[in-house]
């Protein structure tokens, strides 16, 4: 190629690759087959190697390089990334405004200038730029220490969303600047990504925040690159004195440097304007392209901010107002019984679709017959529904004043709706059970339980794939999963495609099948506690599985333990011991375990620390943690010899209280149980 033609060809290749990325990962409409995409990428790489002057900071070839990381390094923030205090009422907002005015010594009637913005529901990060170039990035972590996720942040916004992390700043940036903001998934991108996961046979994410947090903390940057994350900036910090007088000037400077800032940001003069903004945003919150659960109110004047300072956890110059949960009235269409892995029949409520927290919802579950009777839920009722925690659909209560007399109580079937076996409710139990040993619904549930992330973590094996395997007669127990032919996986991943998609469609089932085989291969190496939990032994949850693994130290000893030995295990009572013994002595169960071992599944005992602040302690987790997921926190405690319980009692040694901690925190206070915040919890993990 002539040198004069190289710049135009490089631009063309970059544009085509970006368009293909955007179409595949955001729009869910592949433009190119994988082979054609790889050819274009290789051509661009070769062209840039021959002409280094053509390399741009935002070229697809420059997103990141290198192998996946094995762990994230710790980063100490130059200035702490403090969380915000929460308020939920007008009175509390007025108290905040009054406190600001009092601390500043403002005369009565002089309004405070505020900047208000939607509270973004994503993951807070910090980006460091030197001489205009992006050099490093980290998560908020515990506010003092974060995790180095530079490689992943380099690919945020690499799918044409125009809301990414700039590799080079525009204009005249300072020698060093720290930019803070939120990594998030816009609703359209989240929905497209979930469609793609379902198409590949993988479990979709529950909400955009979980998806964004999980994606940014991937050890393999290539996973992050394939997902349409965005970044919105809201803060800039310099090592010396700020050249800005107001926060609003900072936001304007961030936009001039090439960052996306929130178009809904506003300046308000006084509390009355803040309340008016809050009301407008509450009405529009579900029309916005991203999830938001409130607004953030910040003092605009930076000199005033310095005078106000910060308390131990929160700045005194800012506060977050959180919206109350949205509730809607709807009418129940029907109540029916769903069959789970243990044969338990769970009442499911189908109702007229309603929009809750930005999503259409048409179904919720009731735990059992007693809950249904306690709430007085009837078929045909008008009810109030909400999404608990903005995620899980929940029937709150009926609206008896709207009853017509045609409503009827739901009665559990006498026969299983899936296999036709007898349904029973044993004396003393709250649930109805299917007695069919070969019930397909139970097998599908057991397979999903076996494959879930906290068990053997077989990525991509969800309910639809499990049902397909059962329908084809390929799988009758866990061990059969490891003998499913590659061609069967291909068939399960195949689906009709439009003619114009044929090039990509031919490769998709094979690639998805390869991913499934790889996931099964990875699952062969596991821990004893995960393996015991995956087996679905009655009354053996994660905590009991971990306790059994620590006590016995090997699978053979668990399988051969008699009731007396089992009763000698901490927190294993006579009933649980009897259930475990009955399960391990059932010949069919022993055959499944033997076949799993023969298939190469190797459950190994973990080395548990015998000393340290968690050794031998019972810990309860409540509220949300910003530094890690609940599952990760639980695993860290158990690795250090602790036990995680779901309820607070006098036997509880420690309660870890995160954001929005609830009744467990109150009970811990009433019982005098030691309480640790997230910062102290992270410190204890390091001891």
UniProtKB/Swiss-Prot annotation:
Pfam families: BRCT (PF00533), DNA_ligase_aden (PF01653), DNA_ligase_OB (PF03120), DNA_ligase_ZBD (PF03119), HHH_2 (PF12826), Nlig-Ia (PF22745)
Enzyme active site: 119
Transmembrane parts of this sequence: none
Sorted UniProt keywords: DNA damage, DNA repair, DNA replication, Ligase, Magnesium, Manganese, Metal-binding, NAD, Zinc
Boundaries of every BRCT domain copy: 609-687
Function of the protein: DNA ligase that catalyzes the formation of phosphodiester linkages between 5'-phosphoryl and 3'-hydroxyl groups in double-stranded DNA using NAD as a coenzyme and as the energy source for the reaction. It is essential for DNA replication and repair of damaged DNA.
PANTHER family according to UniProt: CHROMOSOME TRANSMISSION FIDELITY FACTOR 18, DNA LIGASE
Protein name: DNA ligase
Protein species of origin: Anaeromyxobacter sp. (strain K)
Source species taxonomy: Bacteria, Pseudomonadati, Myxococcota, Myxococcia, Myxococcales
Gene that this sequence comes from: ligA
